Design a protein with these regions (language model features):
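Helix-breaking motifs and short loop linkers at transmembrane-helix boundaries and internal kinks
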Residues: 23, 55, 76-82, 110, ...
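Conserved MFS/SLC helix-loop-helix module at the cytosolic interface between two early adjacent transmembrane helices
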Residues: 42-80
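Helix-loop-helix hairpin linking two adjacent transmembrane segments in secondary transporters
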Residues: 121-165
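Extracellular/periplasmic helix-loop-helix junction of adjacent transmembrane segments
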Residues: 12-42, 229
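Cytoplasmic membrane-interface "Motif A"-like loop-to-helix N-cap segments
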Residues: 53-63, 254-265
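Extracytoplasmic gate region of multi-pass secondary transporters
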Residues: 11-12, 190-246
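Cytoplasmic helix-loop-helix junction between adjacent transmembrane helices
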Residues: 86-123
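C-terminal membrane-cytosol helix-exit motif in multi-pass small-molecule transporters
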Residues: 154-173, 362-370
Length: 382
Protein backbone atom coordinates (compact mmCIF):
# COMPACT_ATOMS: atom_id res chain seq x y z
CA UNK A 1 0.00 0.00 0.00
CA UNK A 2 2.97 2.32 0.58
CA UNK A 3 4.05 2.07 -3.06
CA UNK A 4 0.44 2.25 -4.29
CA UNK A 5 -0.03 5.50 -2.40
CA UNK A 6 3.16 6.86 -3.90
CA UNK A 7 2.12 5.83 -7.42
CA UNK A 8 -1.51 6.93 -7.22
CA UNK A 9 -0.62 10.47 -6.15
CA UNK A 10 2.59 11.12 -8.05
CA UNK A 11 1.07 12.93 -11.04
CA UNK A 12 0.20 15.82 -8.76
CA UNK A 13 3.88 16.01 -7.78
CA UNK A 14 5.33 15.91 -11.30
CA UNK A 15 2.79 17.95 -13.30
CA UNK A 16 4.60 21.28 -12.69
CA UNK A 17 7.89 19.73 -13.88
CA UNK A 18 6.33 18.13 -16.96
CA UNK A 19 4.59 21.39 -17.83
CA UNK A 20 7.89 23.29 -17.65
CA UNK A 21 9.82 20.70 -19.70
CA UNK A 22 7.16 20.42 -22.39
CA UNK A 23 6.33 24.12 -22.48
CA UNK A 24 2.63 23.66 -21.71
CA UNK A 25 0.30 24.86 -18.97
CA UNK A 26 -0.38 22.56 -15.99
CA UNK A 27 -4.11 22.61 -16.83
CA UNK A 28 -3.36 21.07 -20.25
CA UNK A 29 -2.13 17.92 -18.45
CA UNK A 30 -5.52 17.32 -16.83
CA UNK A 31 -6.13 14.42 -19.24
CA UNK A 32 -3.03 12.60 -17.95
CA UNK A 33 -4.20 12.96 -14.35
CA UNK A 34 -7.71 11.84 -15.30
CA UNK A 35 -6.38 8.85 -17.27
CA UNK A 36 -4.76 7.33 -14.20
CA UNK A 37 -7.95 7.79 -12.23
CA UNK A 38 -10.07 6.29 -15.02
CA UNK A 39 -7.73 3.31 -15.03
CA UNK A 40 -8.12 2.87 -11.27
CA UNK A 41 -11.89 3.06 -11.71
CA UNK A 42 -11.87 0.37 -14.40
CA UNK A 43 -9.57 -1.81 -12.31
CA UNK A 44 -11.79 -1.49 -9.24
CA UNK A 45 -15.00 -2.12 -11.18
CA UNK A 46 -13.88 -5.05 -13.34
CA UNK A 47 -10.54 -6.47 -12.11
CA UNK A 48 -10.85 -6.39 -8.30
CA UNK A 49 -14.14 -8.40 -8.15
CA UNK A 50 -12.45 -11.30 -9.98
CA UNK A 51 -10.66 -12.05 -6.71
CA UNK A 52 -13.94 -13.23 -5.15
CA UNK A 53 -13.83 -16.08 -7.68
CA UNK A 54 -10.11 -16.63 -8.37
CA UNK A 55 -8.39 -15.58 -5.14
CA UNK A 56 -7.00 -12.30 -3.89
CA UNK A 57 -3.33 -13.25 -3.64
CA UNK A 58 -2.90 -14.07 -7.32
CA UNK A 59 -4.69 -10.93 -8.44
CA UNK A 60 -2.66 -8.65 -6.16
CA UNK A 61 0.63 -10.13 -7.38
CA UNK A 62 -0.28 -9.65 -11.05
CA UNK A 63 -1.58 -6.13 -10.43
CA UNK A 64 1.59 -5.00 -8.65
CA UNK A 65 3.79 -6.19 -11.53
CA UNK A 66 1.61 -4.32 -14.02
CA UNK A 67 1.67 -0.96 -12.28
CA UNK A 68 5.38 -1.24 -11.37
CA UNK A 69 6.58 -1.79 -14.94
CA UNK A 70 4.21 0.76 -16.44
CA UNK A 71 5.18 3.41 -13.90
CA UNK A 72 8.82 3.06 -14.93
CA UNK A 73 7.80 3.22 -18.59
CA UNK A 74 5.92 6.47 -17.94
CA UNK A 75 9.20 8.19 -17.05
CA UNK A 76 10.17 7.92 -20.72
CA UNK A 77 6.93 9.34 -22.16
CA UNK A 78 7.66 11.83 -24.94
CA UNK A 79 4.16 13.11 -25.70
CA UNK A 80 0.82 13.73 -24.04
CA UNK A 81 -0.97 10.79 -25.77
CA UNK A 82 1.80 8.44 -24.63
CA UNK A 83 1.62 9.81 -21.09
CA UNK A 84 -2.17 9.41 -21.04
CA UNK A 85 -2.04 5.82 -22.31
CA UNK A 86 0.59 4.71 -19.82
CA UNK A 87 -1.21 6.30 -16.87
CA UNK A 88 -4.48 4.63 -17.93
CA UNK A 89 -2.89 1.17 -17.92
CA UNK A 90 -1.01 1.87 -14.69
CA UNK A 91 -4.28 2.87 -13.06
CA UNK A 92 -5.89 -0.45 -14.00
CA UNK A 93 -3.17 -2.27 -12.08
CA UNK A 94 -3.60 -0.01 -9.07
CA UNK A 95 -7.37 -0.38 -9.14
CA UNK A 96 -7.15 -4.16 -9.13
CA UNK A 97 -4.71 -4.40 -6.22
CA UNK A 98 -6.07 -1.87 -3.73
CA UNK A 99 -9.53 -3.34 -2.89
CA UNK A 100 -8.03 -6.79 -2.42
CA UNK A 101 -5.32 -5.55 -0.08
CA UNK A 102 -8.12 -4.03 2.01
CA UNK A 103 -10.14 -7.26 1.83
CA UNK A 104 -7.21 -9.46 2.90
CA UNK A 105 -6.51 -7.20 5.87
CA UNK A 106 -10.17 -7.27 6.91
CA UNK A 107 -10.36 -11.06 6.66
CA UNK A 108 -7.38 -11.59 8.96
CA UNK A 109 -8.58 -9.05 11.56
CA UNK A 110 -10.98 -9.55 14.49
CA UNK A 111 -14.45 -8.28 13.62
CA UNK A 112 -14.52 -5.87 16.57
CA UNK A 113 -11.27 -4.23 15.44
CA UNK A 114 -11.71 -4.44 11.69
CA UNK A 115 -12.04 -0.70 11.05
CA UNK A 116 -8.91 -0.04 13.13
CA UNK A 117 -6.91 -2.72 11.31
CA UNK A 118 -7.89 -1.52 7.85
CA UNK A 119 -7.28 2.12 8.80
CA UNK A 120 -3.82 1.23 10.13
CA UNK A 121 -2.95 -0.80 7.03
CA UNK A 122 -4.28 1.82 4.63
CA UNK A 123 -2.36 4.54 6.44
CA UNK A 124 0.73 3.19 4.67
CA UNK A 125 -0.93 4.40 1.45
CA UNK A 126 -0.92 7.90 2.91
CA UNK A 127 2.68 7.51 4.08
CA UNK A 128 3.62 6.54 0.53
CA UNK A 129 1.84 9.58 -0.88
CA UNK A 130 3.51 11.86 1.66
CA UNK A 131 6.90 10.25 1.06
CA UNK A 132 6.41 10.79 -2.66
CA UNK A 133 5.73 14.48 -2.09
CA UNK A 134 8.93 14.88 -0.07
CA UNK A 135 10.94 12.86 -2.59
CA UNK A 136 9.54 14.91 -5.47
CA UNK A 137 10.45 18.16 -3.72
CA UNK A 138 14.10 17.03 -3.70
CA UNK A 139 14.36 14.84 -6.83
CA UNK A 140 12.55 16.94 -9.45
CA UNK A 141 14.89 19.97 -9.18
CA UNK A 142 17.98 17.72 -9.24
CA UNK A 143 17.11 14.83 -11.55
CA UNK A 144 13.90 15.77 -13.35
CA UNK A 145 10.33 14.53 -13.03
CA UNK A 146 11.15 11.11 -14.53
CA UNK A 147 13.23 10.20 -11.48
CA UNK A 148 10.11 10.21 -9.31
CA UNK A 149 8.39 7.66 -11.55
CA UNK A 150 11.45 5.42 -11.80
CA UNK A 151 11.93 5.39 -8.02
CA UNK A 152 8.28 4.48 -7.48
CA UNK A 153 8.20 1.62 -9.98
CA UNK A 154 11.58 0.39 -8.79
CA UNK A 155 10.38 0.16 -5.18
CA UNK A 156 7.36 -1.89 -6.28
CA UNK A 157 9.60 -4.35 -8.14
CA UNK A 158 11.92 -4.69 -5.14
CA UNK A 159 8.99 -5.41 -2.81
CA UNK A 160 7.28 -7.92 -5.12
CA UNK A 161 9.33 -10.97 -3.98
CA UNK A 162 8.32 -10.25 -0.38
CA UNK A 163 4.66 -10.25 -1.43
CA UNK A 164 5.17 -13.53 -3.27
CA UNK A 165 6.61 -15.18 -0.16
CA UNK A 166 4.57 -13.63 2.65
CA UNK A 167 1.10 -12.74 1.32
CA UNK A 168 -1.57 -15.25 2.41
CA UNK A 169 -4.58 -16.30 0.36
CA UNK A 170 -7.97 -15.03 1.49
CA UNK A 171 -10.06 -16.81 4.10
CA UNK A 172 -13.09 -18.68 2.72
CA UNK A 173 -15.75 -19.99 5.15
CA UNK A 174 -16.65 -23.67 4.73
CA UNK A 175 -19.73 -24.28 2.66
CA UNK A 176 -19.99 -20.70 1.41
CA UNK A 177 -20.74 -20.69 -2.31
CA UNK A 178 -19.10 -18.23 -4.65
CA UNK A 179 -21.74 -15.81 -5.93
CA UNK A 180 -22.43 -15.86 -9.66
CA UNK A 181 -23.43 -12.19 -9.67
CA UNK A 182 -21.72 -10.69 -6.59
CA UNK A 183 -22.68 -7.12 -7.50
CA UNK A 184 -26.36 -7.96 -7.05
CA UNK A 185 -25.71 -9.03 -3.46
CA UNK A 186 -24.54 -5.52 -2.60
CA UNK A 187 -28.22 -4.56 -2.72
CA UNK A 188 -29.73 -7.71 -1.19
CA UNK A 189 -30.24 -8.87 2.40
CA UNK A 190 -30.93 -5.33 3.64
CA UNK A 191 -27.73 -3.81 2.22
CA UNK A 192 -29.23 -1.34 -0.28
CA UNK A 193 -29.34 1.72 1.97
CA UNK A 194 -25.85 1.25 3.38
CA UNK A 195 -24.39 0.52 -0.07
CA UNK A 196 -25.83 3.75 -1.47
CA UNK A 197 -24.57 5.79 1.49
CA UNK A 198 -21.10 4.23 1.29
CA UNK A 199 -20.97 5.10 -2.41
CA UNK A 200 -21.96 8.71 -1.71
CA UNK A 201 -19.25 8.97 0.96
CA UNK A 202 -16.55 7.47 -1.25
CA UNK A 203 -17.54 9.63 -4.22
CA UNK A 204 -17.52 12.88 -2.23
CA UNK A 205 -14.33 12.25 -0.27
CA UNK A 206 -12.24 10.89 -3.14
CA UNK A 207 -13.45 13.73 -5.34
CA UNK A 208 -12.10 16.09 -2.70
CA UNK A 209 -8.93 14.17 -1.98
CA UNK A 210 -7.83 13.82 -5.59
CA UNK A 211 -8.66 17.42 -6.38
CA UNK A 212 -6.29 18.39 -3.57
CA UNK A 213 -3.50 15.95 -4.44
CA UNK A 214 -3.70 16.90 -8.13
CA UNK A 215 -3.96 20.67 -7.84
CA UNK A 216 -2.93 21.73 -4.32
CA UNK A 217 0.71 22.45 -5.31
CA UNK A 218 -0.49 24.44 -8.32
CA UNK A 219 -3.19 26.41 -6.47
CA UNK A 220 -0.87 27.22 -3.58
CA UNK A 221 1.77 28.33 -6.08
CA UNK A 222 -0.80 30.69 -7.59
CA UNK A 223 -1.20 32.23 -4.12
CA UNK A 224 2.53 32.95 -3.90
CA UNK A 225 3.70 29.85 -2.02
CA UNK A 226 7.01 28.44 -3.32
CA UNK A 227 6.98 25.18 -5.30
CA UNK A 228 8.81 23.33 -2.55
CA UNK A 229 6.54 24.61 0.23
CA UNK A 230 3.47 23.78 -1.85
CA UNK A 231 4.60 20.17 -2.35
CA UNK A 232 5.48 19.88 1.34
CA UNK A 233 1.97 21.10 2.23
CA UNK A 234 0.66 18.16 0.20
CA UNK A 235 2.90 15.87 2.27
CA UNK A 236 1.49 17.40 5.48
CA UNK A 237 -2.01 16.49 4.28
CA UNK A 238 -0.97 12.86 3.89
CA UNK A 239 0.97 12.51 7.15
CA UNK A 240 -1.78 14.22 9.15
CA UNK A 241 -4.15 11.63 7.73
CA UNK A 242 -1.88 8.84 8.93
CA UNK A 243 -1.82 10.21 12.47
CA UNK A 244 -5.58 10.71 12.42
CA UNK A 245 -6.27 7.17 11.19
CA UNK A 246 -4.67 5.59 14.27
CA UNK A 247 -6.90 7.74 16.47
CA UNK A 248 -10.14 7.59 14.52
CA UNK A 249 -10.03 3.86 13.70
CA UNK A 250 -10.51 2.70 17.32
CA UNK A 251 -13.15 5.39 17.84
CA UNK A 252 -15.07 4.16 14.80
CA UNK A 253 -14.90 0.57 16.09
CA UNK A 254 -16.17 1.66 19.49
CA UNK A 255 -18.79 4.31 18.69
CA UNK A 256 -19.66 3.72 15.04
CA UNK A 257 -18.72 5.77 11.97
CA UNK A 258 -21.84 7.92 12.05
CA UNK A 259 -20.78 9.35 15.44
CA UNK A 260 -17.11 9.98 14.63
CA UNK A 261 -16.52 10.76 10.97
CA UNK A 262 -18.95 13.68 10.44
CA UNK A 263 -16.79 15.75 12.80
CA UNK A 264 -13.69 14.88 10.77
CA UNK A 265 -15.37 15.97 7.56
CA UNK A 266 -16.45 19.24 9.16
CA UNK A 267 -12.82 19.95 10.12
CA UNK A 268 -11.83 19.27 6.51
CA UNK A 269 -14.44 21.66 5.12
CA UNK A 270 -13.37 24.49 7.43
CA UNK A 271 -9.66 24.01 6.70
CA UNK A 272 -10.17 23.78 2.93
CA UNK A 273 -12.01 27.09 2.99
CA UNK A 274 -9.31 28.47 5.29
CA UNK A 275 -6.36 27.50 3.10
CA UNK A 276 -7.82 29.66 0.36
CA UNK A 277 -7.49 32.63 2.70
CA UNK A 278 -3.89 31.85 3.66
CA UNK A 279 -2.29 33.55 0.67
CA UNK A 280 1.48 33.18 0.78
CA UNK A 281 1.55 32.67 4.58
CA UNK A 282 3.38 29.34 4.85
CA UNK A 283 2.76 28.56 8.55
CA UNK A 284 -0.99 29.11 8.29
CA UNK A 285 -1.04 27.07 5.09
CA UNK A 286 0.66 24.15 6.86
CA UNK A 287 -1.81 24.31 9.78
CA UNK A 288 -4.74 24.22 7.36
CA UNK A 289 -3.10 21.37 5.45
CA UNK A 290 -2.87 19.39 8.70
CA UNK A 291 -6.60 19.85 9.33
CA UNK A 292 -7.39 18.87 5.75
CA UNK A 293 -5.39 15.68 6.20
CA UNK A 294 -7.36 14.74 9.32
CA UNK A 295 -10.71 15.15 7.59
CA UNK A 296 -9.92 13.72 4.15
CA UNK A 297 -7.04 11.23 4.29
CA UNK A 298 -7.70 10.11 7.86
CA UNK A 299 -11.42 9.76 7.20
CA UNK A 300 -10.83 7.81 3.98
CA UNK A 301 -8.65 5.31 5.82
CA UNK A 302 -11.65 4.70 8.08
CA UNK A 303 -14.10 4.66 5.16
CA UNK A 304 -12.26 1.66 3.74
CA UNK A 305 -12.65 -0.16 7.04
CA UNK A 306 -16.36 0.62 7.18
CA UNK A 307 -16.89 -0.89 3.73
CA UNK A 308 -14.75 -3.94 4.50
CA UNK A 309 -16.55 -4.52 7.80
CA UNK A 310 -20.01 -4.35 6.31
CA UNK A 311 -19.68 -6.86 3.45
CA UNK A 312 -19.25 -10.62 4.10
CA UNK A 313 -16.22 -12.53 2.82
CA UNK A 314 -17.90 -13.92 -0.30
CA UNK A 315 -18.52 -10.42 -1.72
CA UNK A 316 -15.98 -8.34 0.20
CA UNK A 317 -13.66 -7.63 -2.74
CA UNK A 318 -16.70 -6.74 -4.84
CA UNK A 319 -18.15 -4.48 -2.13
CA UNK A 320 -14.91 -2.66 -1.42
CA UNK A 321 -13.96 -2.63 -5.11
CA UNK A 322 -17.23 -1.07 -6.23
CA UNK A 323 -17.18 1.48 -3.40
CA UNK A 324 -13.66 2.48 -4.44
CA UNK A 325 -14.71 2.48 -8.11
CA UNK A 326 -17.59 4.86 -7.42
CA UNK A 327 -15.10 6.90 -5.42
CA UNK A 328 -12.76 6.86 -8.41
CA UNK A 329 -15.49 8.43 -10.51
CA UNK A 330 -15.40 11.24 -7.97
CA UNK A 331 -11.61 11.24 -8.11
CA UNK A 332 -11.86 11.86 -11.85
CA UNK A 333 -14.45 14.60 -11.48
CA UNK A 334 -12.41 16.47 -8.84
CA UNK A 335 -9.21 17.03 -10.85
CA UNK A 336 -11.14 17.68 -14.08
CA UNK A 337 -13.33 20.32 -12.44
CA UNK A 338 -10.22 21.78 -10.82
CA UNK A 339 -8.48 21.97 -14.18
CA UNK A 340 -11.50 23.67 -15.75
CA UNK A 341 -11.70 26.23 -12.94
CA UNK A 342 -7.98 26.97 -13.18
CA UNK A 343 -8.08 27.30 -16.97
CA UNK A 344 -10.99 29.77 -16.76
CA UNK A 345 -9.07 31.92 -14.26
CA UNK A 346 -11.55 31.53 -11.41
CA UNK A 347 -10.25 33.17 -8.23
CA UNK A 348 -8.28 30.72 -6.06
CA UNK A 349 -10.32 31.58 -2.96
CA UNK A 350 -13.52 30.77 -4.83
CA UNK A 351 -12.08 27.42 -5.94
CA UNK A 352 -11.35 26.46 -2.33
CA UNK A 353 -14.84 27.51 -1.24
CA UNK A 354 -16.31 25.16 -3.85
CA UNK A 355 -13.90 22.48 -2.66
CA UNK A 356 -15.29 22.71 0.89
CA UNK A 357 -18.67 21.32 -0.22
CA UNK A 358 -17.87 17.57 -0.77
CA UNK A 359 -16.78 16.94 2.86
CA UNK A 360 -20.12 18.35 4.02
CA UNK A 361 -21.91 15.94 1.68
CA UNK A 362 -19.94 13.01 3.12
CA UNK A 363 -20.75 14.13 6.66
CA UNK A 364 -24.45 14.22 5.80
CA UNK A 365 -24.30 10.69 4.40
CA UNK A 366 -22.77 9.37 7.62
CA UNK A 367 -25.44 11.11 9.67
CA UNK A 368 -28.07 9.36 7.53
CA UNK A 369 -26.33 6.07 8.30
CA UNK A 370 -27.85 6.15 11.78
CA UNK A 371 -31.12 4.94 10.22
CA UNK A 372 -29.44 2.07 8.37
CA UNK A 373 -29.14 -1.58 9.48
CA UNK A 374 -26.29 -2.74 11.72
CA UNK A 375 -22.82 -2.67 10.18
CA UNK A 376 -21.78 -6.00 11.71
CA UNK A 377 -20.40 -8.55 9.21
CA UNK A 378 -22.03 -11.85 8.35
CA UNK A 379 -21.90 -14.54 11.01
CA UNK A 380 -19.39 -16.57 9.02
CA UNK A 381 -16.84 -13.78 9.49
CA UNK A 382 -16.95 -13.67 13.27
Amino acid sequence: MFVEGYDAQLMGFVVPGIARDWGVSPASLTSAIAAGLIGMTLGAFFIAPLADSYGRRRLVLYSVIIFALLTIATAFAQSLPMLVGLRLLTGIGLGGAMPNAIAITAEFSPSAKRASAVAAMFSSYSVGAGFGAILAAHFVPLYGWGSVLISCGGMALLLWPALLIAMPESYVPKGEAKPKIPVGRLFSEGRSWITILIWVIFFANLMELFFLTSWLPTTLGAQGVSDRAAVLATAVVQFAGVAAAFTMGPLVDRFGPQRVLPAAFLIAALCIAGIGLAGAEVVFTMVMAFGIGIGTVGAQNCNNGVAAKFYPTSIRATGVGWALAVGRVGSIVGPVVGGILLSTKVDIRTIFLFAAVPPLLAAGAYLCMGRAPNLEPAASDN
